[in-house]
Amino acid sequence: MSKRGRGGSAGNKFRMSLGLPVAATINCADNTGAKNLYIISVKGIKGRLNRLPSACVGDMVMATVKKGKPDLRKKVMPAVVVRQRKPWRRKDGVFMYFEDNAGVIVNAKGEMKGSAITGPIGKECADLWPRIASAANAIV
């Protein structure tokens, strides 16, 4: 299994079900003015021939804005996935999933571009990204 690096974050993450392959469109859960994000790559994935790199909650991805403010569109920017629809199993045996796929726009260090997050975020994301956890109103 390939190592999954975390740029600019502390802590480790257990293996999760990867629910968001490259070319997935996810909602933007912050107040930057972006409506949705298009995943173009996943940070820290080495991969295998013909296998699409995929992301899960807590992963940093490179994304572009497909709908939103004109000054945000047509630029590649880092984002962190905070919710996914695909169920994953936690170490305590609980299967967890959200009702949508969502991410927040960050800088290379993992600091949020926006100041607020709409909706809950996963505990796995909150453990890895403290700046995102402080802006979240609910951590599940």
From Swiss-Prot:
A GO cellular component annotation in the UniProt record: cytosolic large ribosomal subunit
Protein name: Large ribosomal subunit protein uL14
Residues in the signal sequence: none
One Pfam short name: Ribosomal_L14
Source organism of this protein record: Nicotiana tabacum (Common tobacco)
Gene3D superfamilies, per database record: Ribosomal protein L14 (2.40.150.20)
GO BP annotations, alphabetical order: translation
Database matches in InterPro entries: Ribosomal_uL14, Ribosomal_uL14_CS, Ribosomal_uL14_sf
Lineage: Eukaryota, Viridiplantae, Streptophyta, Embryophyta, Tracheophyta
SMART domains named among the record's database cross-references: Ribosomal_L14 (SM01374)
